[in-house]
Amino acid sequence: MILNLFISKKQYTASLAKKRLKTLIKKKKKFFYQSSYLPQLKNDLLLVIAKYIKIQPNKMSIQIEKRKKNLLILEINITNVK
């Protein structure tokens, strides 16, 4: 009976560690997509959008989220548009 307490705790700990590792890998992948080309993408989009709307570079934010294996969601937020 005492042995069961230790075994179940190990299984719980292993399960928890596995969940944490999956979360860490998921966040790292998300960070990679956001960090690798995001600054250049933001600059390029700013130039294109500035042709049509007067905006300040610091008022624009871009988020990229990977939803599926071959699907990225691009979200652009612009505040104080004039």
UniProtKB/Swiss-Prot annotation:
Would you say which domain of life the source belongs to?
A: Bacteria
Q: What biological process terms from GO does the record include?
A: cell division; regulation of division septum assembly
- One short Pfam name that applies is MinE
Task: Quote the SUPFAM superfamilies the UniProt record gives.
Answer: Cell division protein MinE topological specificity domain (SSF55229)
> Which UniProt keywords are present, listed alphabetically?
Cell cycle, Cell division
Q: Which InterPro entries match?
A: MinE (IPR005527), MinE_sf (IPR036707)
Q: What does this protein do?
A: Prevents the cell division inhibition by proteins MinC and MinD at internal division sites while permitting inhibition at polar sites. This ensures cell division at the proper site by restricting the formation of a division septum at the midpoint of the long axis of the cell.
Q: Which HAMAP family match?
A: MinE
Would you identify the family this protein belongs to, as annotated? Belongs to the MinE family.
What name does the UniProt record give this protein?
Cell division topological specificity factor
User: Which organism is this entry from?
Assistant: Buchnera aphidicola subsp. Cinara cedri (strain Cc)
| Taxonomic lineage from the root | Bacteria, Pseudomonadati, Pseudomonadota, Gammaproteobacteria, Enterobacterales
